[in-house]
Amino acid sequence: EFLKKRKEKIDFCLVGEPTNPDKLGQMIKIGRRGSMTGKLSIIGVQGHVAYPQRANNPSTALVQILKELKDIKLDQGSKNFQASNLEVTKININNSADNVIPKIANAVFNIRFNNKHSSNSLKNKLNKIIKRICKKNKSKYKIEYKVSGEAFLTKPNKITYMIQDIVKRITKIKPKLSTTGGTSDARFIRKIAPCLEFGLVGKTMHKVDEAVSLSDL
């Protein structure tokens, strides 16, 4: 945003993210999958287990929704991207009583998606499923989404191959052009310029005693 305000133009950007799995020179990132988290709450009617007709168990709708979301085949992947994937990361009913039907059931899921989707297209798809199942179960719901980044791809060009050749010349390894992994800071700069990512080996990133090889530096 700062560069946009200054109307600065960048021809190409090389981002120094830790792109290499085991050895320096293995991988150059030419894009990244998008990431979106959904926080879902199903609201039912609390009651006694012995009198289910007087209650509405939100966990019933929640389980049905999560199963359908997990069973969706969002796509088959593409030439540059692996298939999009949804994972349920939290389920919480927060009910301390064994014989009480809860009022609220919560879950969190995360989607890593390729460039066949946008966060908005995925929201529309998921919301239809959630709405349909909640209507069938006569339950209410709340859904909040957080988008960490959209999927993007820098199509290989002469600069890509130049960098690939330089890396091979120095490391004696021809780097693979890849879009695997999580989001990165390249998602910010790609809005104003084509970019690639190449950096150190990421085996210990975010771990205790994080370290890199001096020779790699």
Which positions does each model-derived feature cover?
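Acidic/histidine-rich catalytic neighborhood of metal-dependent amide-processing enzymes
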Residues: 1-31
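Metal-dependent amide/peptide-bond hydrolase catalytic core
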Residues: 19-23, 30-31, 36-217
